[in-house]
């Protein structure tokens, strides 16, 4: 997980939160690629078709790793888990939960060139960026 891009991390997390069992092959396709291969959505969709019969043990280990990564990220970057898009409120606010891909767009200021840079960032660097941006907006 240390080499994940922000895009891979956010895409896998959004799919996991939406319906981790239905999206298991796609989540595996996003996170498990040949070394050095960049993430491409079309390739991931094709790979997901081939992973449909993947053993449940692999899925469970993959999910345990993703959950462990989130626990570490939450310890290091807690502000990322209180959404800046909902003013950092927790609980039932009547608003739809912020998606990780929305945070990625927010971190890139919703500008195409900046968003592409953010997508290619390492996931840990992305979390540090989001955490610092939340801090900056909180002190304005």
Predicted features by range, described:
Residues 1-140:
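An amphipathic, hydrophobic-aromatic interaction surface with interspersed Lys/Arg
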